[in-house]
């Protein structure tokens, strides 16, 4: 399976979906891992650590969403990321469903 790890784009989110150690484990199990360029920088991981673990560094999140079978994130996808998801692509992330509802939606009883 081809696993993609984009850089988190939600403000003040510095984590990344996979650490280099996790990448090493997944690659050892036969998976291909794509990590967005400098995706782990804010979490304290550089591109070199990911490549040494077996990941391929790709330029943009769009490249990851276009090529990966599964997307691994920390935070709920932002609209631009939802728009990049493909049919039958798996998204592995935390979801914050309360953020999906507005007061208008909560009042809708239909």
Label every model-predicted segment.
Residues 76-91:
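Rossmann-fold NAD(P) dinucleotide-binding segment
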Residues 5, 72-73, 92-93:
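Redox-cofactor binding/interface segments in oxidoreductases and associated redox assembly factors
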Residues 101-110:
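Single conserved hydrophobic/aromatic residue that forms the stacking wall/gate
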Residues 54-67:
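Short acidic low-complexity segments
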Residues 64-77:
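Rossmann-like NAD(P)-binding element
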Residues 37-56:
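N-terminal beta-loop-helix "entrance" segment that forms/cooperates
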Residues 7, 12-36:
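Glycine-rich phosphate/diphosphate-binding loop of Rossmann-like nucleotide-binding domains
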């Amino acid at each position: 399976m081809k696993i993609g790890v984009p850089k988190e784009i939600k403000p003040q989110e510095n984590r990344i979906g996979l650490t280099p150690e996790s990448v090493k484990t997944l690659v050892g199990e036969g998976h291909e891992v794509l990590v967005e360029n400098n995706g782990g920088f804010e979490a304290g991981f550089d591109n070199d650590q990911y490549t040494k673990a077996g990941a391929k560094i790709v330029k943009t999140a769009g490249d990851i969403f276009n090529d990966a079978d599964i997307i691994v994130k920390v935070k709920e996808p932002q609209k631009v990321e939802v728009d990049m998801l493909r049919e039958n692509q798996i998204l592995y992330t935390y979801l914050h469903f309360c953020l999906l509802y507005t007061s208008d939606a909560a009042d809708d009883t239909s």
